[in-house]
Amino acid sequence: MSDTSKGIPQEQLPSQELHPPPMPVINLGHLSLDDPTVRSRVVNDIAKACRDLGYFQVISHGISQSVMDGAIEAASEFFKLPNEIKKEYASDDIRQPVRYDTSSKDGISMSRAFLKHYAHPLCDWLQYWPQQPPIYREYMAKYAVEVRVVALKLMEAILEGLGIGKEYMQEKFEEGLQLLSVNCYPKVSQSDTSIGLAAHSDYGLLTILLTSCQGLEVVDRSSNSWKVVQQLPHALHVHVGDHMEVLSNGRIKTVVHRAVLNPQEARISLASIHGFALHEKVSSAKELVDEENPQKYKENSFNDFLEHLTANMDNRQRNFLESLRM
């Protein structure tokens, strides 16, 4: 083991070999077909992936390659800006509508620069987004709008798969928040054991991830080991979030994942995080609670998550989901 680990715990070190996890690939276009048998099969495939793994990839999702490439380009150009421009958005206040920062926290050596900003309703938040590079607002907005459509389609299918109906709390989903986490992970040497982002699960209901190259790892539940996610052309990666586990009363489990650094090239990732509005409480669906399956989680909101995070900034064990278990 290289002594360049800089105090990284053994379980956090990047995987040394490629072990692709079982990765369901869902053709999302089939949800829109008139054939109810095909739709039912896709809904069942999504339900199984959420239940067994907590992640899957989608193709034929309706976002053009040019829109995806434009978002990656806008992100890449932002991170190439001089530091004095990027630092205009620097803040330790996690409630800022736009926030730029770099990661080296929790006593673990991490290498990441990120820009986070809200994206829905777009008319409320676009004015706060970076004006440099000139393409940023236009290209990123196109992607934000289209990926949100994908998220709503997925939410309908997941709720249908849970047996509570695709219209369940539809208005709350449509009026909910969207947060874009735009990340840049540097290229590193093979001997560098720094990671990009430590192991974590995502808050919110769903995260849809677009990446420029390989670097995502997930915990495979069957072996309790890290697995490298292979990069599929034109695919989006979907993560189940903490709030989905709460809403499903534990029928669906959030996925633990991390970002590792790529020795071939710098990596851009765009995580679009979707959930209820800031103060809207998420609780286990009453249809999924009974004597055999009592309520397992306390109701909570995205604002509750922010308060928990703020209160536990220096605590390496600040697992929000664990704090919700009853």
Swiss-Prot record:
Induction: Induced by light. GO terms for molecular function: flavanone 3-dioxygenase activity; L-ascorbic acid binding; metal ion binding. Residues 175-276 form the Fe2OG dioxygenase domain. Its EC number is 1.14.11.9. Expressed at very low levels in roots, leaves, stems and seeds. Residues 1-15 have a biased composition (Polar residues). Keywords: Dioxygenase, Flavonoid biosynthesis, Iron, Metal-binding, Oxidoreductase, Vitamin C. Its cofactor is Fe(2+); L-ascorbate. This is Flavanone 3-dioxygenase 3.
